[in-house]
Amino acid sequence: MNIIFYHPFFNAEEWLAGLSQRLPQAQVRAWQPGDDRPADYALVWRPPHEMLANRGRLKGVFALGAGVDAILEQERAYPGTLPAGVPLLRLEDTGMAQQMQEYALSYVLRYFRRFDEYQLLQQQQEWRPLDPHQQDNFTIGILGAGVLGKSVAQKLTAFGFNVRCWSRSPKQIDGVQSFAGAEQRAAFLDGVQLLINLLPNTPETAGILNQQLFAHLAPGAYLINLARGAHLVEDDLLQALEQGQLAAATLDVFVTEPLPQAHPFWRHPRVTITPHIAAITLPQAAMDQIAANILALEAGQTPAGVVDVLLGY
């Protein structure tokens, strides 16, 4: 069994050693340009087109993250990047759900307790208590009800918040009001005071966080984008903040990463930036899951995390 690995930022030595330990029957190597030797499985993140092209004998392509949009974007730009008929698999949880819960809860509480406003008041040396928000009339909406969206919804519900979610198809989450489909999106947004985006990045969801959507939220709402930068129309966010339609935004993802130094988000007093760290891939847990899925494929079983390429997740 031959496995090729490519990630521009991960420690390749750590991954090769970890995978070899878990799959001693496998020959694991870091892919380099010009490497066209046989491979049964590919572990990738934003792979160059030539890495997977003409590898029709692959048994599986593993995305080294929860999202597969980078691979599918490559396929749209360079057809053949993803060999036809080869299953594409993504990581499911591997510690990401807990990280996402922690991140979302931290910033929900920051806005709910108005700590962001107190920080601005401190900079102005102004001592002024603010009226607190009340959970009874502080509705949180979550776009996306997959593994991460569901996990965040459950955490916030357990904290006593009124939570609703929206997804492409109906989902059932205990204690959470569910909306589905384009026909229910406006009803989902109505009255939401804090919106969290955890949608998959697909052509259908690109640019969904725009002025039209913001107008449906409660005046002075908050936005937390934890999915992909492509979901957000950045100029529309700046306009919504300027007009007071949105009170503040926390952004972990951006159209261009790293965020250019001249970007206005850096200096905006009501925009909080983190460098795409809301839920990072934990190597040991990820290797455990990938190894288990490879063994499942070798045994003719259905592995976890198989992606519907047409849907994009």
From Swiss-Prot:
GO cellular component term, pick one: cytoplasm
Catalytic activity annotation: glycolate + NADP(+) = glyoxylate + NADPH + H(+); (R)-glycerate + NAD(+) = 3-hydroxypyruvate + NADH + H(+); (R)-glycerate + NADP(+) = 3-hydroxypyruvate + NADPH + H(+)
SUPFAM superfamilies: NAD(P)-binding Rossmann-fold domains
Chief location category: cytoplasm
Catalytic residue positions: 228, 276
Cell location: Cytoplasm
Molecular-function GO terms, alphabetical: glyoxylate reductase (NADPH) activity; hydroxypyruvate reductase (NADH) activity; hydroxypyruvate reductase (NADPH) activity; NAD binding
Cited CDD domains: GDH_like_2
UniProt cross-references to Gene3D superfamilies, sorted A to Z: NAD(P)-binding Rossmann-like Domain
Pfam family, one: 2-Hacid_dh_C
Protein family membership: Belongs to the D-isomer specific 2-hydroxyacid dehydrogenase family. GhrA subfamily.
HAMAP family given in the database record: 2_Hacid_dh_C_GhrA (MF_01666)
The protein's name in its UniProt record: Glyoxylate/hydroxypyruvate reductase A
Organism of this sequence: Serratia proteamaculans (strain 568)
